[in-house]
């Protein structure tokens, strides 16, 4: 990579994942990829050093497929980033809000800007990507078509921001995993760490309760727990879990020992510094 540091993301240039890359790793070159699988592959084959992978959103919930892709990729989670989602209404230069007739954006973003759609009486048109919608509005060159995307997408596509912060909720935040081919180099175990792991239990009464009992006993805080059926089977369930702590520190180490006793399989996907965002009120 000739000294150039590259971080890959899923989406078009100007996507919120692109913005997350630029804020989390200032000065790095961002590499857009079409899918999450291609984003992971870019790191795996050496085209990028890191991958920025959206994992959950405060309004839309979990991002699918990440739990299935990461274990098979041979990557490690080495960090996390929280990105505030601030939707902007974008139009071609010289256009105004009064010109707008059709609004283009990703379906999740469309559901988050119902207020502006109603206020302006716009016809919603669903597109594959927020930044992709901005590119299309630029290419069409019509004042009647506007896009909902980031301020970065406006900058990269030469569009005007007709109105900022058109999102209905101000607490719209996306959390990202930052993944690498190598595990994070960390200081000795102590406070301020997060651990992400997968584990599997049988669908039997009390199985999950027993598996997680050690967390409560050890005083370990669990911040995320997602369940997934395995390969279409109803006989076993896989869980993706984020917990506070380092697996070599006594509280979490004890909890993981108990978890391994009651679970069929356990795999740590990464140990990494907790984001400063977690300390915000």
UniProtKB/Swiss-Prot annotation:
One GO term describing the cellular component: cytoplasm
Pathway: Amino-acid biosynthesis; L-phenylalanine biosynthesis; phenylpyruvate from prephenate: step 1/1
SUPFAM superfamilies for the chain: ACT-like, Periplasmic binding protein-like II
Molecular function GO terms recorded: hydrolase activity; prephenate dehydratase activity
Binding positions for L-phenylalanine per the UniProt entry: 207-208, 221-222
EC number(s) reported in the record: 3.5.1.97, 4.2.1.51
Keyword Hydrolase among record annotations: yes
Catalytic activity line of the entry: an N-acyl-L-homoserine lactone + H2O = L-homoserine lactone + a carboxylate; prephenate + H(+) = 3-phenylpyruvate + CO2 + H2O
Keyword Nucleus among UniProt keywords: no
Cysteine pairs bridged by disulfides in the record: none
GO biological process: L-phenylalanine biosynthetic process; quorum sensing
Site (Essential for prephenate dehydratase activity): 174
Domain annotation ACT: ranges: 196-273
Limits of the Prephenate dehydratase domain: 6-181
Alphabetically ordered keywords of this record: Amino-acid biosynthesis, Aromatic amino acid biosynthesis, Hydrolase, Lyase, Multifunctional enzyme, Phenylalanine biosynthesis, Quorum sensing
Subunit record text: Homodimer.
Functional description taken from the UniProt entry: Multifunctional enzyme that acts on N-acyl-homoserine lactones (AHLs), beta-lactam antibiotics and shows prephenate dehydratase activity. Acts as an acylase on AHL and hydrolyzes the amide bond of the acyl side-chain of AHL molecules, releasing homoserine lactone (HSL) and the fatty acid. Can use different 3-oxo-acyl homoserine lactones, such as 3-oxo-decanoyl homoserine lactone, which is the preferred substrate, 3-oxo-octanoyl homoserine lactone, 3-oxo-hexanoyl homoserine lactone and 3-oxo-dodecanoyl homoserine lactone.
PANTHER family in UniProt: PREPHENATE DEHYDRATASE P PROTEIN, PREPHENATE DEHYDRATASE-RELATED
Record note on domains: Consists of three domains: the N-terminal and middle domains form the functional unit, which is homologous to the catalytic PBP domain of the prephenate dehydratase, whereas the C-terminal domain is homologous to the regulatory ACT domain.
Protein name, entry field: Bifunctional N-acyl-homoserine lactone acylase/prephenate dehydratase
């Amino acid at each position: 990579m000739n000294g150039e540091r590259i971080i890959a993301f899923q989406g078009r240039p100007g996507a919120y994942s692109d913005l997350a890359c630029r804020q989390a790793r200032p000065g790095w070159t961002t590499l857009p990829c079409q899918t999450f699988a291609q984003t992971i592959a870019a790191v795996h084959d050496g085209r990028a050093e890191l991958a920025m992978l959206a994992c959950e959103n405060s309004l839309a919930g979990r991002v699918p497929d990440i739990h299935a892709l990461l274990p098979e990729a041979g990557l490690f989670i080495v960090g996390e980033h929280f990105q505030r989602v601030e939707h902007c209404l974008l139009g071609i230069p010289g256009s105004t809000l009064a010109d707008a007739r059709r609004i283009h954006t990703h379906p999740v973003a469309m559901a988050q800007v119902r207020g502006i759609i109603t206020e302006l009486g716009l016809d919603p048109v669903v597109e594959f990507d927020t930044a992709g919608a901005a590119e299309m509005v630029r290419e069409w060159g019509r004042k009647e078509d506007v896009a909902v995307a980031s301020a970065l997408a406006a900058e990269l596509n030469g569009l005007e921001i007709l109105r900022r912060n058109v999102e209905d909720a101000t607490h719209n935040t996306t959390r990202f995993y930052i993944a690498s081919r190598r595990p994070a180099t960390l200081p000795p175990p102590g406070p301020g760490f997060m651990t992400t792991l997968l584990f599997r239990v049988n669908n039997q009464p009390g199985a999950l309760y027993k598996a997680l009992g050690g967390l409560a006993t050890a005083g370990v805080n669990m911040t995320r727990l997602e369940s997934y059926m395995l390969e279409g089977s109803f006989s076993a369930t896989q869980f993706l879990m984020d917990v506070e702590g380092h697996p070599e520190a006594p509280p979490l180490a004890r909890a993981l020992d108990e978890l391994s006793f009651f679970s069929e399989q356990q795999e740590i996907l990464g140990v990494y510094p907790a984001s400063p965002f977690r300390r915000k009120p």
